Each structure stands twice: as structure tokens, then as C-alpha cells.
């Protein structure tokens, strides 16, 4: 998420795009969060300070009691965590915590599509102001970010909805099939360059996350995706409790992720034959 925002910021700084002109966003999990953050229409300095300097370990605590409580909640975190994370941003824009997707669209004028997966029916869910107009924005965020163990799934209308990464990690084809001009699409695709081995020293969480990411990798749809000229491949690490904990606790780790995203944007501009500022 930090890398993606830094990429967009650097591209705008170099006049490659204008974020305020974005009309439609397709994203899953962290990509969906990036879309929401952009749609809130903060300036980059305010948004960067919020994301880098906020003590996120207080919002997403990882301790023994938290782990024990997860058994009944089906996850370490739930809607209360999402509310705590987004409340300062929504308050700053005089938006309610209960704002619906329809009302958020009226505010942002951006057509956001967030992708999740319904376990009960084994199908991908496209969450937008068109498909779920009365759904609360924060519930939609929980749905697309409900990675097993970390975030509790959302159970409504006979559906059990979790993170869409297992079926639609990079919704490029969904975006193209909607009829959007392919030359006007900017894609930011995450690629994991390292796949840590599960060993005798691995924890239960390492084992579960390792399995999830292997499953996502096996379901990779790169070969089925239409190539686009405006695509940035962002190098990311597989999520582990250690990586998550470090990013939540350490401001410098978050700064490094921003810097990594900035460098990826510059490399893209360089390869595109464009000078950067």
C-alpha cells in the first residue's frame, strides 16, 4: 500500500498523471485501500504524514489476548479496527463512519470497484456503488481486506466474504472489460520476488500465510491478462507476522516502503523514455 501511494505521488510529481482526474479505480485488498485514500482527496503531504507518522501498532495491536479473541471473531481484527483506522480521515472530511458506497461516490465522483471472494458460493464479488449502493464503505473495506486469520470475514445475505486476492488479485481484465480505453489505464501490479520456505522454525501464522500466498500464486492470471503500456510492477514481500509487525511499529520501515515505491516510479518513467524531476 505504501509503495503504491508513493508510485502515484511520484508519477504526478513528474506530470505523468493527474490524480484529481482519475475517474475509475479497480483494486483488491491493499489496492482498494489505495483507491479509497485517493478518493478522500487529501493533499499528498497530509496523507503521507498520516500514513508514516501514525502509531499503527496501536490501531492493529498484535498480542496474546488479541490472538485468543480471534477464535470467536474469526480473525485478529474486525470492523472496529477498520473504523479506528479510517475515523481521523473521515472526520477531517466531515464524512460519517456509516457512509454508504453510494454517498461516498457522490462525495468523490470516483467509480471505485473493490474485489472480494464469497466462500459460500466460490465466486468473485465486485463491490461498488452500483452493485452494493447501501453497503457501508468501511464494511466494503473489511470485505476486500479480510485475509484469513488477520481480518474477520463479513457474513451477510448467506455470503461469507473475504479478501479477493484468492480469485482476483489484480483486476485488470475486469477494468478492461468494462469498456475503459486501454490506453488510459494505469496498472500497478504487485509481484513477490521472495517466497520464504516453511521450516521447523516457522510459526503457525507463517504456515497459514505461506499456504495462502502459494494458493494465490497458483491462481495467478498473468497469462490471461491483456498487456497494457502503462503498467508498473511493484516488488513486494510475502506477508508474515514479522513483516506486518515491523511495518506497524517502525516509522522508518514505512518511510523505506515509500522510498521503494518512489524509486519504482522513477524506473518506470526512465524505461518509458521520460525524464523525471
Show where each model-derived region lies.
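Patatin-like phospholipase
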Residues: 1-28, 33-277
Amino acid at each position: 500500500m505504501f509503495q503504491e501511494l508513493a508510485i502515484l505521488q511520484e508519477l504526478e510529481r513528474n506530470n505523468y498523471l493527474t490524480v484529481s482526474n482519475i475517474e475509475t479505480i479497480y483494486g483488491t485488498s491493499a489496492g482498494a485501500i489505495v483507491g479509497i485514500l485517493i478518493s478522500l482527496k487529501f493533499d499528498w503531504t497530509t496523507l503521507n504524514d498520516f500514513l508514516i507518522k501514525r502509531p499503527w501498532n496501536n490501531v492493529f495491536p498484535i498480542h496474546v489476548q488479541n490472538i485468543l479473541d480471534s477464535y470467536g471473531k474469526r480473525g485478529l481484527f474486525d470492523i472496529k479496527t477498520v473504523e479506528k483506522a479510517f475515523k481521523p480521515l473521515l472526520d477531517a472530511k466531515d464524512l460519517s463512519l456509516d457512509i454508504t458506497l453510494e454517498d461516498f461516490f457522490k462525495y468523490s465522483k470516483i467509480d471505485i470497484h473493490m474485489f472480494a471472494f464469497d466462500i459460500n458460493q466460490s465466486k468473485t464479488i465486485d463491490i461498488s456503488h452500483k452493485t452494493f449502493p447501501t453497503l457501508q464503505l468501511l464494511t466494503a473495506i473489511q470485505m476486500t481486506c479480510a485475509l484469513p486469520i488477520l481480518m474477520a470475514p463479513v457474513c451477510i445475505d448467506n455470503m461469507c466474504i473475504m479478501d479477493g486476492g484468492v480469485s482476483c488479485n489484480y483486476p485488470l481484465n475486469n477494468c478492461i472489460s468494462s469498456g475503459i480505453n486501454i490506453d488510459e489505464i494505469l496498472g500497478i501490479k504487485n509481484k513477490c520476488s521472495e517466497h520464504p520456505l516453511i521450516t521447523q522454525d516457522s510459526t503457525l501464522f507463517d504456515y497459514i500465510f505461506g499456504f495462502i500466498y502459494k494458493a494465490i500464486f497458483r491462481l495467478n492470471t498473468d497469462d490471461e491478462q491483456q498487456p497494457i503500456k502503462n503498467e508498473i510492477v511493484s516488488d513486494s514481500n510475502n506477508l508474515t507476522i514479522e513483516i506486518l509487525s515491523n511495518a506497524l511499529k517502525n516509522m522508518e520501515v514505512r518511510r523505506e516502503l515509500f522510498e521503494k515505491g518512489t524509486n519504482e516510479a522513477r524506473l518506470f518513467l526512465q524505461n518509458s523514455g521520460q525524464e523525471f524531476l
